[in-house]
Design a protein with these regions (language model features):
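Gly/Ser/Thr-rich loop/hinge elements
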Residues: 180-237, 275-281, 285, 292-298, ...
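Terminal peptide-recognition signature
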Residues: 55, 98, 138, 173, ...
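N-terminal Sec-pathway targeting helices
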Residues: 3-30
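STAS-typified acidic loop motif
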Residues: 127-153
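Membrane-interface motif at the C-terminal end of an N-terminal transmembrane signal
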Residues: 24-43
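Low-complexity, Gly/Ser/Thr/Pro-rich intrinsically disordered linker/tail segments
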Residues: 301-304, 308-327
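Extended, small/polar residue-biased N-terminal targeting/export presequences
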Residues: 65-133, 327
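Short acidic catalytic loops
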Residues: 138-139, 160, 164-180, 240-241
Length: 327
């Protein structure tokens, strides 16, 4: 009798464990089934049509132009384009069309091989720094790399400013050719030139998200970053150089300085990719870069994929910047 009671007790304990576990598994499967397609996750491989429809749904839910009349008609066209799709690749034309209309010119689709090729071909380029008399010249290139590479990138400019802080009476920040990438290391590199607070904003359809600097920590900018010199602020004039290749995060960094005293831009209008992309991975490894927000300056100006005009348009921006800084 005692043996039966012990067995019954063990059975009740086992069932008590199994039932909550089953509920957890069921809940997990429900979540994956509902939200997984947004991240390329499925319980079973999707059909080509399902794959395409889910991609279009993600674009329509998050794209910056999803409320436009053009998108409404384009969405129906894209659905028809994937009706007879036999492979995931067959849906790519419809996805690309949807991205261009609902996401704008900054949005793209990259196949798995294209994404891998881009990653493999990226050459790490570090900032270059120098002193021109009492003027610091800092050139920040585009950046796309690991967190460790980002810290290495930022450290070049951070250490240079720290070591020469008593000599520097002005800064040239050269963003020409900076096509973007991860803004975190870029902003961290020059955080000593920026005041703590909200630097710029990502302007979504119904709300804003600020890029912030506090105690040396950059937040909401790519991978972010933390300066080893949070208390050091170099309050000197800053001249920013831009050209037609200054794009995306390069433009966002330019806007971090917009509206500040003793800041002036020189050169040519930027590329006009003043928007924020979100990465969505698809089931087959393809990646959608979808524009979900515009850049907004602390001045309240919203840049809807428009160029940032320089304060001084010139073919000799470095010379003009040095002249201004020394005047």
């Amino acid at each position: 009798m005692k043996s039966n009671k012990r067995n019954n007790r063990k059975l009740r304990i086992a069932l008590g464990i199994c039932i909550p576990l089953a509920l957890i598994i069921a809940a997990t499967l429900t979540v994956v089934a509902k939200y997984g397609p947004d991240f390329g996750l499925y319980l079973v491989p999707p059909s080509a049509e399902r794959y395409g429809k889910d991609a279009l749904a993600t674009i329509g839910k998050n794209g910056i132009y999803s409320g436009s009349d053009e998108w409404k008609s384009t969405y129906e066209e894209c659905l028809k384009m994937i009706e007879n799709a036999e492979s995931y690749e067959d849906t790519y034309p419809a996805i690309k069309k949807a991205l261009s209309v609902c996401g704008g010119k900054h949005s793209i689709l990259m196949t798995k091989s294209e994404s891998q090729s881009t990653s493999d071909s990226y050459d790490e380029v570090l900032p270059t720094v120098s002193l021109n008399g009492d003027i610091a010249v800092i050139k920040l290139p585009d950046f796309l790399g690991t967190a460790e590479a980002g810290r290495k990138y930022a450290k070049v400019a951070e250490d240079f400013i720290h070591e020469n802080r008593d000599k520097i009476n002005g800064v040239v920040l050269d963003l020409r050719g900076n096509t973007g990438g991860d803004m975190g290391p870029m902003a961290t590199a020059v955080s000593s030139l920026l005041p703590d607070g909200e630097l710029m904003y990502y302007h979504y359809r119904s709300y804003d998200v600020p890029v912030t600097l506090k105690d040396g920590v950059i937040s909401n900018a790519g991978t972010g970053g933390k300066s080893p010199y949070p208390d050091e602020k170099l309050k000197v004039p800053v001249a920013i150089l831009t050209d037609g290749m200054t794009a995306s995060s390069g433009e966002a960094l330019t806007l971090c300085f917009r509206g500040l005293e003793n800041v002036k831009t020189f050169g040519a209008p930027t590329a006009g990719y003043t928007s924020v992309n979100m990465l969505y991975s698809l089931y087959d490894g393809a990646q959608m870069y979808l524009t979900v927000a515009f850049d907004k300056a602390r001045t309240g100006e919203i840049f809807k994929e428009t160029s940032i005009e320089p304060d001084v348009a010139t073919d000799s921006p470095l010379e003009a910047a040095l002249e201004w800084l020394r005047s």
